[in-house]
């Protein structure tokens, strides 16, 4: 099965007809605000509103730090289905890979698949995201780092099996991390979380996949993220 393309998302047709959209970001600490300043989901919201106007839709952040797929299933009805989304951007797995959580790769796959099917039952499209290639050398315990690699591959496989869109941050960021660790670490707050520039980069990359850009006066505020994006593009050339 081939993964869904971003151009196929129903929100594009809705926006062209001037219909109101609702987009929900669902996940853990990398979805919830982890530090002050603009967050990757803010850049997504700004990009849509720059193109389609400030009243084009609601952009709801439903991330909770420390969550696993078990937690997302538990709070699904109240904190996702409640919003009746047209699109869900789901980023999960960084806590499932913690050995203390006792979530096996098989359970992670099953839970993620169930989440996708529940979201589809709402009539919503899905963008699955992998994490941003965490700093595996600095993750403790080492077993968590190994599990992280496994779980991110599962995200890719579920995206294909469930025909969702995929934003594969992990694969993109890994090229920089594995080639230039010093530059990669300029985008990280710690081994598991991005800093301001990392947030900019994720948001700008997502906007590009949606076929959108920020207004020129907004782009002037995003020079670090744009430079990081250009650097990563060179590793994909």
Model regions and ranges:
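A short acidic, helix-capping loop that chelates divalent metal ions and anchors anionic groups
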Residues: 32-34, 70, 96-101, 135-140
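Cell-envelope and extracellular/periplasmic
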Residues: 62-67, 91-102
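Serine-esterase "nucleophile elbow" of acetyl-processing enzymes
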Residues: 1-65, 70, 75-84
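Active-site segments of SGNH/GDSL-like serine hydrolases
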Residues: 91, 95, 116-152
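Charged, glycine-enriched surface loops/patches
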Residues: 105-129, 154-164
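Catalytic His-Asp segment of secreted/periplasmic serine-dependent ester chemistry enzymes
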Residues: 133-237
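Glycine-rich anion/phosphate-binding loops
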Residues: 67-74, 102-112
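Structural recognition of the beta-strand scaffold that forms the well-ordered cores
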Residues: 23-25, 58-61, 87-91, 126-130, ...
